[in-house]
């Protein structure tokens, strides 16, 4: 049985980052709403509790509070931002409006010697004070410490930026250690979870396979399962895991909607039919999808059409498999959170996700989601442990609607063919080009990155088809052809992203190859927009 950390969500958009940091320390955790019952908290039996931030204020009429059981359990508790404020209020302290709100980078001074911050600092002042570079986002502040607490950190505008009652194992910080902007944040969370809470670091993906296989076998029994295989990381790992558990009881349905990457269908079939010997039904539905997309330019309308047609094609095939009782999906934890359907009802809906829908109800099937509690990095680890090739497992993210949302405006087969080839050239050059010492000296990458491919040094890279033409010259003749945009970003969590500073020589080579090898494109541009304000995908 794994030690568990209970994360109570008060509505922060970055609560899942807390969970990711805890999992990265190889400790299992779950996110639940802050208003779960005392009985639930006791039955969960956490090794420690973490209280998240929130957009709310402790002054609102319906203040969000932690269950009383949190304080009665006798386990360590860490409050983050709003979590610190509710800890203060519930334990006898005082919170008030702050005249100096803090949003963004801040430098926090550590006070005293606490187990949480001891020895953790980013720099030392001339006076010898240890300082931390952190990320703040708050409007209220703790004005009076609760009985038994001592000051742990401060800023000029927030005199109580951290507090601790070490006798009870209660710690709280006004900043966000879970975000990458807090330089030593991961170290703080690891110390709380591993040293203060004493949780065992035994949440390891290669060991998780045995548990997951046993759970799938227990759920499914001798019944059959159908799974929509997209070629993406999530559905591929789900298929490999389920096949490991039940073998030929699984049938994978691979729908080619005409909007896949170059040679993607062949790669998927070679992997699952050839290497894993799984049952795969391959359906070429490109004519159907492209026909319904004709004349449609609105991005959301395109997404809905692609989703609707996939359901229609998948349903038709599923009905032929009359013995199937389960529908398997590659849903992962962020999908569930972003769809507002996580174990926490406080999560704000960001977008509708293509994996979370009504298919099980319309088909009358039970739902099997073996990756539902895993983050993307854990899914990748699991895939490698299952024997999937790294080039499949560590592929960059690809949207559910495929190239349909990387072709701006109307989708046509001609556009998809041009984009497929341009994108393949971009990815090939990224894979084949390694970072050099000169790149590091120019500040394009770190010294530790020298020798790594630029594909591995970017988090997501792709080409976009622009439905506009520009004038060019090739040979002695005038051309009037389409434009492609190249997009490459670097990010740790995909919530924010920086555009990748690729070497000019690499970009020049990609542009030259696309213009010379893809007849119909005569210009390539590079997108240098960050997120925010831009999103990573163009549509």
Curated annotation (Swiss-Prot):
Q: Coiled coil as a keyword?
A: no
Q: Catalytic activity annotated for this protein?
A: XMP + L-glutamine + ATP + H2O = GMP + L-glutamate + AMP + diphosphate + 2 H(+)
**Would I find Isomerase among this entry's keywords?**
no
Residues annotated to bind ATP: 230-236
Q: Which residues form the Glutamine amidotransferase type-1 domain?
A: 4-202
User: One Gene Ontology cellular component annotation?
Assistant: cytosol
What residues sit in the active site? Answer: 81, 176, 178
An example Gene Ontology molecular-function term: ATP binding
- For the protein in the UniProt heading, the enzyme class is ligase
Which SUPFAM superfamilies does UniProt cross-reference here?
Adenine nucleotide alpha hydrolases-like (SSF52402), Class I glutamine amidotransferase-like (SSF52317), GMP synthetase C-terminal dimerisation domain (SSF54810)
Named in its record, the pathway it takes part in is: Purine metabolism; GMP biosynthesis; GMP from XMP (L-Gln route): step 1/1
The enzyme's E.C. designation: 6.3.5.2
List the InterPro entries: Class_I_gatase-like (IPR029062), GATASE (IPR017926), GMP_synth_C (IPR001674), GMP_synth_GATase (IPR004739), GMP_synthase (IPR022955), GMPS_ATP_PPase_dom (IPR025777), NAD/GMP_synthase (IPR022310), Rossmann-like_a/b/a_fold (IPR014729)
Coiled-coil regions listed: none
Q: Which Gene3D superfamilies match?
A: 3.30.300.10, 3.40.50.880, HUPs (3.40.50.620)
Q: Which UniProt keywords apply?
A: ATP-binding, Glutamine amidotransferase, GMP biosynthesis, Ligase, Nucleotide-binding, Purine biosynthesis
Please report the stretch or stretches of sequence annotated as the GMPS ATP-PPase domain. 203-395
The record describes the protein's role as:
Catalyzes the synthesis of GMP from XMP.
Quaternary structure?
Homodimer.
Protein name per its UniProtKB record = GMP synthase [glutamine-hydrolyzing]
Which organism does this sequence originate in? Burkholderia multivorans (strain ATCC 17616 / 249)
């Amino acid at each position: 049985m794994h030690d568990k950390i209970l994360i109570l969500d008060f509505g922060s958009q970055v609560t899942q980052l807390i969970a990711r940091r805890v999992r990265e320390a190889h400790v299992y955790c779950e996110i639940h709403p802050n208003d779960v019952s005392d009985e639930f908290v006791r039955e969960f039996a956490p090794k420690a509790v973490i209280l998240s931030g929130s957009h709310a204020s402790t002054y609102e009429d319906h203040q969000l509070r932690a269950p009383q059981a949190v304080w009665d359990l006798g386990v360590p508790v860490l409050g983050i931002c709003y979590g610190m404020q509710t800890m203060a209020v519930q334990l006898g302290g005082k919170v008030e409006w702050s005249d100096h709100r803090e949003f963004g980078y801040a430098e926090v001074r550590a006070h005293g010697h606490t187990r949480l911050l001891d020895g953790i600092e980013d720099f030392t002042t001339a006076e010898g004070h240890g300082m931390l570079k952190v990320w703040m986002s708050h409007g209220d502040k703790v004005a009076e410490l609760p009985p038994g607490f001592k000051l742990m950190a401060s800023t000029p505008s927030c005199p109580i930026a951290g507090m601790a009652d070490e006798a009870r194992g209660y710690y709280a910080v006004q900043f966000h250690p879970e975000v990458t902007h807090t330089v030593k944040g991961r170290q703080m969370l690891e110390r709380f979870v591993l040293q203060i809470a004493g949780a065992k670091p035994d949440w390891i993906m290669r060991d998780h396979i045995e548990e997951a296989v046993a759970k799938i076998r227990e759920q499914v029994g001798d019944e059959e399962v159908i799974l929509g295989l997209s070629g993406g990381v999530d559905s591929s790992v789900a298929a490999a895991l389920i096949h490991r558990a039940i073998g030929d009881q699984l049938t994978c349905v691979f729908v080619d909607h005409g909007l896949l990457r170059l040679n993607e269908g062949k790669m998927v079939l070679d992997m699952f039919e050839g290497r894993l010997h799984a049952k795969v039904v391959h359906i070429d539905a490109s004519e159907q999808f492209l026909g319904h997309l004709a004349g449609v330019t609105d991005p959301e309308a395109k997404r809905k059409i692609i989703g609707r047609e996939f359901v229609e094609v998948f349903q038709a095939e599923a009905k032929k498999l009359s013995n199937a009782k389960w529908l398997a999906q590659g849903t992962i934890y962020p999908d569930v959170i972003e769809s507002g359907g996580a174990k926490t009802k406080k999560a704000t809906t960001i977008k509708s996700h293509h994996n979370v829908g009504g298919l099980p109800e319309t088909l009358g099937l039970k739902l099997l989601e073996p990756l539902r509690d895993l983050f993307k990095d854990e899914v990748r680890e699991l895939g490698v442990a299952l024997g999937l090739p790294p080039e499949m497992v560590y592929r960059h993210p690809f949207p559910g609607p495929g190239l349909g949302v990387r072709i701006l405006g109307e989708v046509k087969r001609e556009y998809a063919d041009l984009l497929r080839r341009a994108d393949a050239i971009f990815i090939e050059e990224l894979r084949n080009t390694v970072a050099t010492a000169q790149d590091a000296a120019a500040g394009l990458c770190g010294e530790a990155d020298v020798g790594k491919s630029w594909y591995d040094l970017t988090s997501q890279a792709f080409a976009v088809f622009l439905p506009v033409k520009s004038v060019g010259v090739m040979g002695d003749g005038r051309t009037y052809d389409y434009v492609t945009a190249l997009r490459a970003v670097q990010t740790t969590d995909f919530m924010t992203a920086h555009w990748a500073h690729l070497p000019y020589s690499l970009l020049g080579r990609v542009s030259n190859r696309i213009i010379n090898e893809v007849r119909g494109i005569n210009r390539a541009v590079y997108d240098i927009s960050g997120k925010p304000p831009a999103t990573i995908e163009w549509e």
